[in-house]
Swiss-Prot record:
NCBIfam families named in the record: trpB (TIGR00263)
Pathway note: Amino-acid biosynthesis; L-tryptophan biosynthesis; L-tryptophan from chorismate: step 5/5
Gene: trpB
Organism expressing this protein natively: Methylorubrum populi (strain ATCC BAA-705 / NCIMB 13946 / BJ001)
Stated role: The beta subunit is responsible for the synthesis of L-tryptophan from indole and L-serine.
Domain of life where this protein originates: Bacteria
Residues the record lists as N6-(pyridoxal phosphate)lysine modifications: 106
Gene Ontology annotations for the cellular component aspect, listed alphabetically: cytoplasm
Cofactor(s) this protein cannot do without: pyridoxal 5'-phosphate
Family: Belongs to the TrpB family.
Catalytic activity, as annotated: (1S,2R)-1-C-(indol-3-yl)glycerol 3-phosphate + L-serine = D-glyceraldehyde 3-phosphate + L-tryptophan + H2O
Keywords annotated in UniProt: Amino-acid biosynthesis, Aromatic amino acid biosynthesis, Lyase, Pyridoxal phosphate, Tryptophan biosynthesis
One example GO MF annotation: tryptophan synthase activity
Name of the protein: Tryptophan synthase beta chain
Subunit (UniProt): Tetramer of two alpha and two beta chains.
Amino acid sequence: MTLNPAPNSFRTGPDERGRFGIFGGRFVAETLMPLILDLEKAYAEAKADPSFKADMESYGTHYIGRPSPLYYAERLTEHLRASAPAGQGAKIYFKREELNHTGSHKVNNVLGQILLARRMGKPRIIAETGAGQHGVATATLCARFGLKCVVYMGAVDVERQAPNVFRMKMLGAEVVPVQSGTRTLKDAMNEALRDWVTNVADTFYCIGTVAGPHPYPAMVRDFQSVIGIETKQQMLALEGRLPDSLVACIGGGSNAMGLFHPFLDDREVEIYGVEAAGHGVQSGLHAASLTGGRPGVLHGNRTYLLMNEDGQIADAHSISAGLDYPGIGPEHAWLHEMGRVTYLSATDTETLEAFKLCSMLEGIIPALEPAHALSKVLELAPTKPAEHLMVMNLSGRGDKDIPQVAQIFGQTL
């Protein structure tokens, strides 16, 4: 990794071409270009319209349940201090995005995109989903606003996330199992892009993470930034100062970007992103694009990708369906190269330990995705002084993972 000179601000991207340094952009078929430009224009207009912001805030409060609490994880903090050297052991806070309606951070972004789709007069919404959380959030808001909803989901994920598949169908969505490729998130996204090209007139593609062609990475980040904005306000109210560090898990990276972005220019705040190391980065069975990948183009943007020797996209593996994406949002790739954010990775085994510990100590069953972040909190917190304030984004609840984790632990439900 080469450290480039630090810019005056880490928050000015992307440029007018949708780039963060050499990352991002819009590498799409000619047929999609008019749609992308329309979307960019509509988003710029919505951002400048006070009524759009008012709608976001109103539905955020009364439908999603914002603000989400910033919660002091007291027993976890004490547990880690007990085995840390004297005077060590950070004070740990959870940003509780799992308490949102639909059970994760995904709904923040979907609300913004669905309100935008309505402004653009698009009655049909398509989405891709891995763990099913983005699919559920999209189906939920389509039901709320009476829009047709089609969700593409890899056939493997359909099997391991059965509760969410049923939820989507209950909400009136059509769930399309994708049988091509690895039959996971990457393939679901490919199918959704194909659908969009075919149905340009009436369809809005609601992307679930900070990936895809510009303006999606910036737009999704903006809609998720409510997480970091609230965290700043809440921490100032609780502790009278900013946190010392932030930790979040990363698949495509929208929950992390939402927490990180408002803090990027607060240079004293350490920022950690946690990718999925699967069976270990050396094993080849992982989803850690920054740790084990290299720059390339996928799904309309240039970013770090998992590739084989021939430059073909490699299979990603993670215990968590929401993290097994072979790429990462382009802004994360840029922040990695600039050295502003430190990217770590957590194995399946470490994640399961954190999943158990959080459940037992805090009475919160986390999703497997934020359990990756928690596993690194367990490592980082004991190395920090006791006055260090650490915030982890608890981006989703674990209900969807209970059948899978029960099976791993040898329990039959």
